[in-house]
């Protein structure tokens, strides 16, 4: 969850001003507290939310937020969940925003709902009420709540709300340097009909959805079977292009198809692969940086290599 600023403790609430029957001395009358409430964002709020996002994250262009909100508008979402996320309003004017990406999955034959919070911003004078949106989001129906890009100053806040780390750092791998495993081939999403092995409807949808959002998505297969892969283009220190792993069925698939995947990404100008996890990627040259971009969850944690339908893949943060 990107955070524009450090909010006060989410549990802190401003005490309402006490209104007495008569003034004490010459004290100025105390202003009444603003009428605050948290509620789900609706289509009617989009213009106001867009302004808040541009205000809170000025380094991102306005078009980025247009695209993100339009993507949320077009997505299928589980019943009873918010399409866009939550806002805080004061006197019916939006003063805070928290976007949420909520998705239904079939994982290992079991239906599950996963929700990822993103882009948390509250105007400075209302920052003591930032936790209202967090509470609203955590009341929404989900089996897993994700915060994949928390700002460091929010670690303690989300830990107080029951979040725990499911990754502690970032692995950097060079799959193109692997020489074994020849014979595998890569099929882009527009060539899935050529696959020798069945591509399930869920895998096909996942690949197409992330490709449409700007990811490098493809199917890789060898003589034994095929697997989907999704990566997102990133930049290390604004100079070195790299590919962040967004999705694979099993992290061992990255090792199994390392040579084919690495060469395909190399042709896209992406020699380095980033994997959020807790150790190096086994069987691929690289390093692991501990305590670098840790990710948090509440509820059932996703497995390593599954950031599907999160801000990492859909928004490109």
Question: Residue spans of the language-model regions?
Answer:
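Short hydrophobic alpha-helical segments enriched in small aliphatic residues
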Residues: 4-6, 12
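Amide-forming acyltransferase catalytic core, primarily the GNAT-like/NAT-type
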Residues: 21, 49, 57-85, 89-92, ...
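A short beta-loop-alpha structural element at the N-terminal edge
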Residues: 35-49
């Amino acid at each position: 969850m990107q955070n524009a600023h450090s909010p006060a403790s989410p549990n802190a609430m401003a005490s309402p001003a006490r209104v007495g029957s008569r003034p004490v001395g010459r004290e100025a009358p105390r202003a009444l507290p603003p009428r605050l409430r948290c509620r789900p964002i609706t289509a009617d709020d989009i213009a106001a939310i867009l302004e808040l996002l541009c205000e809170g994250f000025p380094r991102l262009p306005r078009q980025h937020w247009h695209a993100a909100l339009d993507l949320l508008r077009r997505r299928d979402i589980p019943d009873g969940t918010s399409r866009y996320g939550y806002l805080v309003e004061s006197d019916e004017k939006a003063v805070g925003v928290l976007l949420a990406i909520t998705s239904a999955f079939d994982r290992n034959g079991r239906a599950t709902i996963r929700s990822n919070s993103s882009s948390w911003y509250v105007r400075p004078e209302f920052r003591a009420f930032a936790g209202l949106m967090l509470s609203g989001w955590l009341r929404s129906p989900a089996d897993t709540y994700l915060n994949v890009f928390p700002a460091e100053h929010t670690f303690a806040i989300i830990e107080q709300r029951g979040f725990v780390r499911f990754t502690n750092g970032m692995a950097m791998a060079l799959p193109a340097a692997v020489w074994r495993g020849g014979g595998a081939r890569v099929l882009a999403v527009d060539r899935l009909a050529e696959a020798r092995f069945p591509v399930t409807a869920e895998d096909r949808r996942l690949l197409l959805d992330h490709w449409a959002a700007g990811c490098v998505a493809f199917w890789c297969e060898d003589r034994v079977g095929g697997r989907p892969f999704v990566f997102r283009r990133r930049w290390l220190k604004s100079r070195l292009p790299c590919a962040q792993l967004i999705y694979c069925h099993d992290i061992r698939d990255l090792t199994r198809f390392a040579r084919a995947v690495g060469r395909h990404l190399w042709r896209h100008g992406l020699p380095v692969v980033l994997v959020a996890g807790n150790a190096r990627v086994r069987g691929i040259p690289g390093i692991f940086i501990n305590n670098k971009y840790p990710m948090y969850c509440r509820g059932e944690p996703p497995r390593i290599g599954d950031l599907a339908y999160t801000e990492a893949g859909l928004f490109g943060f």
